[in-house]
């Protein structure tokens, strides 16, 4: 047994095996995509930039139940609510600190009316920290911009909910 181990270490057996493995994959077709020019298809469950949705009549979906704020493990969501004259509650402030967010999707799962969702946008880099502090208006704009894709993804995913 010692002679076998000595022979393997003398002939650098592990390095040779590793080089053959490298050569094997070197000549296979590449699986990498060239990202900015080529974009892969996103899953309907992709968790990207947050958005607040509206009903088709334009009314905000959020009922200020604060379940998303309570369930957020990173404590990235801050909500302030006010009761309306008709008895319903609406948010006066809905902020998400995207620098704290871990994109777990628990806020989306907790929402009883599908108001807060993580949309399909994965390219939302910014130049300043302040731009990553999303307020209600920014979230509603995101929802309006991506509503057609978000609605389709939620419909596809509805069989699993």
Swiss-Prot record:
According to its UniProt record, this protein's enzyme class is: translocase
Which Gene Ontology cellular component annotation is one that this UniProt entry carries? plasma membrane
**How does the cofactor bind to this protein, according to its record?**
Binds 2 [4Fe-4S] clusters per subunit.
The record's listing under InterPro entries reads:
4Fe4S_Fe-S-bd, 4Fe4S_Fe_S_CS, NADH_quinone_OxRdtase_chainI
What are the 4Fe-4S ferredoxin-type domain coordinates in residue numbering? 52-82, 92-121
Keyword Iron-sulfur appears in the UniProt entry: yes
**What membrane topology does this protein have?**
Peripheral membrane protein
Tell me, what's a Pfam family for it? Fer4_7
Query: Its Gene Ontology molecular function terms?
Result: 4 iron, 4 sulfur cluster binding; iron ion binding; NADH:ubiquinone reductase (non-electrogenic) activity; quinone binding
Q: Which residues bind [4Fe-4S] cluster 1?
A: 62, 65, 68, 111
Entry cofactors: [4Fe-4S] cluster
Q: What is its main location?
A: membrane
- Return one Gene Ontology term, BP aspect: aerobic respiration
Q: Which reaction does this chain catalyze?
A: a quinone + NADH + 5 H(+)(in) = a quinol + NAD(+) + 4 H(+)(out)
- This entry's Enzyme Commission designation comes to 7.1.1.-
Q: Which UniProt keywords apply?
A: 4Fe-4S, Cell inner membrane, Cell membrane, Iron, Iron-sulfur, Membrane, Metal-binding, NAD, Quinone, Repeat, Translocase, Ubiquinone
Q: Where in the cell is it found?
A: Cell inner membrane
- Residues annotated as binding [4Fe-4S] cluster 2: 72, 101, 104, 107
Functionally, this protein is described as follows: NDH-1 shuttles electrons from NADH, via FMN and iron-sulfur (Fe-S) centers, to quinones in the respiratory chain. The immediate electron acceptor for the enzyme in this species is believed to be ubiquinone. Couples the redox reaction to proton translocation (for every two electrons transferred, four hydrogen ions are translocated across the cytoplasmic membrane), and thus conserves the redox energy in a proton gradient.
Q: How does it assemble?
A: NDH-1 is composed of 14 different subunits. Subunits NuoA, H, J, K, L, M, N constitute the membrane sector of the complex.
State the family named in the UniProt similarity comment for this chain: Belongs to the complex I 23 kDa subunit family.
Q: Which PANTHER family match?
A: NADH DEHYDROGENASE [UBIQUINONE] IRON-SULFUR PROTEIN 8, MITOCHONDRIAL, NADH DEHYDROGENASE UBIQUINONE IRON-SULFUR PROTEIN 8, MITOCHONDRIAL
Q: Could you tell me what this protein is called?
A: NADH-quinone oxidoreductase subunit I
Q: Which organism is it from?
A: Orientia tsutsugamushi (strain Boryong) (Rickettsia tsutsugamushi)
Q: What is the lineage of its organism?
A: Bacteria, Pseudomonadati, Pseudomonadota, Alphaproteobacteria, Rickettsiales
